[in-house]
């Protein structure tokens, strides 16, 4: 089993992906590295670059990532369908 890199945001603990992540952390404690951090995104181009990098990680390395954004305005998380895309990926691969 690959190593899962889990980064979760704390703005709304009722989101579906948070429940999934918690379940995975409980089920596979030896395979998961848990990090918390804050990102400050200053431009759309930076945001897109980071999203593209995340997609490459998910596709090429078997890593899933949920981003902690509690230092940013919460609207950023919903922008461009990022939360939906990550949540859908988690459900597809891990449910």
Named regions from a protein language model:
Residues 21-28, 42-95:
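Charged interaction segments
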Residues 1-41, 45:
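Extended, hydrophobic alpha-helical segments
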């Amino acid at each position: 089993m690959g190593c899962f890199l889990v980064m979760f945001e704390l703005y709304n603990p009722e989101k579906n992906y948070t429940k999934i992540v918690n379940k995975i952390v409980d089920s596979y404690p030896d395979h998961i590295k848990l990090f918390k951090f804050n990102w400050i995104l200053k431009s759309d181009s930076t945001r897109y670059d980071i999203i593209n990098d995340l997609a490459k990680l998910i596709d090429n390395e078997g890593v899933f990532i949920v981003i902690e954004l509690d230092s940013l305005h919460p609207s950023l998380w919903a922008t461009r369908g990022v939360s939906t895309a990550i949540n859908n990926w988690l459900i597809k691969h891990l449910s």
